[in-house]
Amino acid sequence: MHQDAMQGSIYEGSRRNTISKPSNNNPPLDMSSLNNDFGQQLDSLATGVGSGSLNGTTNPSSNFNDSNRSNISSSLRSEMEMSNNLLKNTQNDTWTSTVGLSVPENQEAMNFNEGPTGISSIASKNNSSITSKLQNNSNLSVTSSANRGRTSSVSSSYDPSFPWGPRMSSVSSGKQHLSSLSLHTHFNPSSSSTVSSDSLESSQQKAPSSSSTATPASAASEIISNKDPVVEPTHSASNAANSGSNTIRARQTTRTRSNTLPWSPRVFGPTLGYNTPPFGYPPTTSSALPNASGSSSSFFGLPTAVSASAGTSFSDISPAAPKASLENNIASNASSLLNPVGLDHFSAASGWSRDFNHLPASSLATARSSLTGNAKSGIDSSVTGMPSDNYARVVESSTAEFFDPSLASSFGLTNYRTKPLTTGFNHPRPQGHGLNTSLFNTSSGGSLKSPTFEVSNRLGDVDTVPDLPPLGSLSSRPKPSSSSRRRSQSLSAMLKTSNPYMPSPSLLSGSLANSSEHSSSPRLRGSPIHNQPVSSSKSTASLNTNNNGLRASTPEMANISTRSSSESNNTNSWPTVGDATIENLTQHEPTHALWVGNLPSGVSATTVATTFSAYGTVSSIRMLSHKHSAFLNFDSVETAKHVLEELNGKRIFFGSDPVCISFAKVASSSSESSHSAVDGLNKAFSNVSFVPSLREVYDDLINVVQSFGFKDLSKIYQILNAACELTDFAAQIPSISKAFSSRRLNAPKLRQVRKRIDNGLCTQEEVEDIAINWLDEVSDLSSDHLGNTVVQKLFDYCSDPVKEMMLERIAPHLAQIGIHKNGTWAAQKIVDVASTEAQMRLIAKHLQPYIPLLFADQFGNYVVQTCLKFGAPMNDFVFEAILNQFWVIAQSRYGSRAVRACLESPDVTEEQRVLVAAAITVYSVHLAMNGNGTLLLTYLVENMNYPHIPILLTRRFVQDIVRVCTHRLAYNSLLKIISISQGDTACGDLVVDAILDTQNDLNPNSLEKILFEQTYGPSFICKLLTHENISASHRQQLQSAVRNVLGTMEDRGSSELKKLAEVCA
């Protein structure tokens, strides 16, 4: 009876100490006092365990009276509570160890007939034996005593991949000398304390030697003593020095870390070990589960042949189980792997499986063996409950590949990128995902209500935790399948299958992926699994896209219905990918409309239409920028079929993924009218045909150049032919944030270098030494707010060979540096100081694909203008790009002004200037209807003195006289052209003839159309009648025609028509 009371008290005390929150005011540990407490408890407990009979065995102390037994029970309970608190405060100092007591030693320790003295001697023997094994075992996990305390996140010695150990040097082998490390174990606290003090002394001795460096002989050597101008936050100059400083910081702290255990609950049982309640569902007898009987056979990765029922309650546990001693319990429990799932330790990988029951049995040996497979781990899968095929492949400890939904394309291709894994104290623990005390069953002593976690077999690091299910799925009752209605991207939208402990398949963009494929795909931490029930009437279809899985990136994309197997065989239609509306807009029957998907982000309608116009005539285009797709209408069905066969699944844009093309349904008349304004490349005005390409206007350009009075056309032909051959223009310039390193630059060192160079304290040789030592960082420095000034100084003072070395590193990124607010200054300086032909050719090679985009950028256009100083023929690549993409450049805000600046530059030859003037003349009608293009047209008329400019422009304007006269910008340009020819009425008379020409097939009854457009038409006719550069005969003809048209008009209420009637009266 007293024994049962003692057992209940012990259990209640252990449970109370385990579940209660730790106090933050606990004093720091004193290893010497800890050793004394252990010795006293060993003696007292050895005396206490002898009271009563254990399974029929007899103890020497069985003749004690009831009062003695009561005192022993009370003393034992008090000591057990002290031990619980003691080990609980030191739980995070416990590290995984595979060293334990051998079988003979266990048997010797389990002999109770030797009395208290024998027990003490055996304990001493076991402690010394364990200490010797710890010191002789080369596979022991060791950590510096300095880093056991909670360190600051800005500490230079903090390493997320090795949270409680010192930072390992990047050039070392990753191993540290045992003299600077201490062993953390619960076997012998005194030995741990001794090693810790030795470690501190060793680190203090090593610190001066490691930090002492030779004084540089010169100023430059002092500057470049640290060759890298980049600060690595995870690097430390001296591991031992930092270890010693952190030891002081660890001693001063009084904050305990008992609440930093992983999410899986650990119950501190009466055997002074960490027990885990049964997780099995249904209950199993596998030794992979914790043995509730108190035996050491099933504690955390120590597999034996002994198993116990998972349903054993804690009330049946005796204070000391048969054949179990305190030392053995400590060896098998307290020093075992406390956190097989999420506790930070030095192992670079962790074994994962889809079976949740294996988690408590994941020992250090299992984690280490996952690198080489289960066959080499030395652990029997039948004992641990971990099947060999459930091991996930591991990745490096510093980075992991994960799914980024922000990079997912509109039609469902999964994108991956790498991200440094953060771990340690600042890592978000699973408590943030909603796991709290409500998840524990109060009647089972801290066990979870149901193990319905869907632990996917995925990539993970040592601190990766499985995704938690919604709170509603933690019931032991099986859940029915959810309805097919799509819900928001929340945890409650997860599919609850009838089997609560088996992962369910998910619908991935119209194709079924089995559970193994799904579980192997990496996902963001805490991201929900968007599963969808699949109807059996739908057949599965798979699409091979270079081993990239298909995943619905948005809920609406998952609604794309799958097609039949016969339809899925058509690879040209890409049936299983697309945006939210592609299912309703695409079809298999050939049409003159095409849907183009997987377009690069930021691509313009101009670029898309120009690219596809090379394969056929494009009549219109409609962009869906938010869906990364577009709809193109061609002139015929045959053209659309030809484009689909030629370009489907190919990379047609520089640096982008293959495009997806399929036939689209022809839009209705209502949708056509709503998009009539978006017609071709010109988005500034409606009903305008596509601007012709350079090849189409090649002969026209030559004729205009000849009209300007040029006879020698050899150089003209050379530039035009080279411009026609250009086809590799980029669709976009990569963002500097993707190429720029995330490392923090050393601002003080950069300021020091710049100041010394500005003050003349460094010779040219010293400056070149700095440049050579910083070659690997010069590209990143060019875009930094301080680094770009240093790069400019380096290019100013270095010789040509050194500048070429730096330029080889910078030139591939020169375009993206040039459009950066800081990098544009460095890019302009690099281009400006280029003096050799090799440097100029290298710059031209890497800038030419980006010339149109640089012209349209507020910073990049200055980089292009700086290239003009190269002189001909080195700067011909700029004018070749202008001629090839003239309309794209001229219609942009910065491009039109940059072209005008190029025409004014003294570094431009006459051949280059006349070619640009001829291009302005040929594209004059399109430029007149664009606000930015009007600037170039005005510059040509007012500032360029080539002959016959007014008459050449007028002849082109009268070809589309109605649109020119009714456009708010174009008609002003036409009046300016007429006014430029002083005393010459040829241009004005030509315009009047075009308006009155009834034989014009393109614009019959032009005057009526102009007057009926009452916004700008009547105003233009009124100004034309009062213009002085029109002959009298043509003026009278126009007045007579206007009176006749006004007589037929019923509505003449506008002010412009009234004014026009007064002029013609």
From Swiss-Prot:
Residues 592-666 form the RRM domain. Residues 1-78, 130-265, 422-573 are annotated as: Disordered. InterPro entries: ARM-like (IPR011989), ARM-type_fold (IPR016024), Nucleotide-bd_a/b_plait_sf (IPR012677), PUM-HD (IPR033133), Pumilio_domain_protein (IPR052645), Pumilio_RNA-bd_rpt (IPR001313), RBD_domain_sf (IPR035979), RRM_dom (IPR000504). It comes from the Eukaryota. Keywords: Cytoplasm, Phosphoprotein, Repeat, RNA-binding. Residues 16-44, 134-151, 169-189, 247-262, 434-455, 495-522, 529-551 have a biased composition (Polar residues). GO terms for cellular component: cytoplasm; cytoplasmic stress granule; cytosol; P-body. The modification Phosphothreonine is found at residues 260, 554. GO terms for molecular function: mRNA 3'-UTR AU-rich region binding. Its main location: cytoplasm. The modification Phosphoserine is found at residues 506, 511, 515. Pfam families: PUF (PF00806), RRM_1 (PF00076). It is found in: Cytoplasm. GO terms for biological process: nuclear-transcribed mRNA catabolic process, deadenylation-dependent decay; stress granule assembly. SUPFAM superfamilies: ARM repeat, RNA-binding domain, RBD. Pumilio repeats lie at residues 771-808, 809-844, 846-884, 886-917, 919-954, 956-993. Residues 712-1065 form the PUM-HD domain. This is Pumilio domain-containing protein P35G2.14. Residues 59-77, 190-224, 236-246, 470-483, 559-573 have a biased composition (Low complexity). It comes from Schizosaccharomyces pombe (strain 972 / ATCC 24843).
